[in-house]
Curated annotation (Swiss-Prot):
GO molecular function: structural constituent of ribosome
HAMAP family referenced in this protein's UniProt entry, alphabetically: Ribosomal_bL17 (MF_01368)
Stated name of the protein: Large ribosomal subunit protein bL17
Entry-linked InterPro entries: Ribosomal_bL17, Ribosomal_bL17_CS, Ribosomal_bL17_sf
Biological processes, Gene Ontology terms: translation
PANTHER family: LARGE RIBOSOMAL SUBUNIT PROTEIN BL17M, RIBOSOMAL PROTEIN L17
Keywords assigned by UniProt, alphabetized: Ribonucleoprotein, Ribosomal protein
Cellular component, GO annotation: cytosolic large ribosomal subunit
Family according to the record: Belongs to the bacterial ribosomal protein bL17 family.
Length: 131
């Protein structure tokens, strides 16, 4: 039986996995959309969603917990000042994982991971006005 086998190992050591998901979480929180393989995307959801939930309660202890996991001050500031208030009324489910075809070379299933409620329409309008 495959009960209680927690996470995907992804053919990596635990330190490599931890560093990879830290980097992927930072990239996702910075750019709000990333492209990766489907198994990594599903595992990344388990890392990022608790971080956003942490960002909804801005206390010093929560900031320190977030910094301990992300190790990037700029991202921690964005998490608590921008993303926490954005998702204040949403109870979980902050990410969308879209299947994105297959990668050339090894045919790995790819996925697009994005934060919900991104303010992309305003950015597109500002770029159109600037051009």
């Amino acid at each position: 039986m495959r009960h209680r086998h927690g996470l995907r190992k992804l053919n990596r050591t635990s330190s490599h996995r931890q560093a990879m998901f830290r980097n992927m979480a930072n990239a996702l929180l910075r750019h709000e959309v990333i492209k990766t393989t489907l198994p990594k995307a599903k595992e990344l959801r388990r890392v990022v969603e608790p971080m956003i939930t942490l960002g909804k309660k801005p206390s010093l202890a929560n900031r320190r917990l977030a910094f301990d996991r992300l190790r990037d001050r700029e991202i921690v500031v964005k998490l608590f000042d921008e993303l926490g208030p954005r998702y204040a009324t949403r109870n979980g489910g902050y990410l969308r994982i879209l299947k994105f075809g297959f990668r050339d070379g090894d045919n790995a299933p790819m996925a697009l991971v994005e934060l919900l409620d991104r303010p992309e329409a305003e950015v597109a309008e500002q770029e159109a006005v600037a051009a």
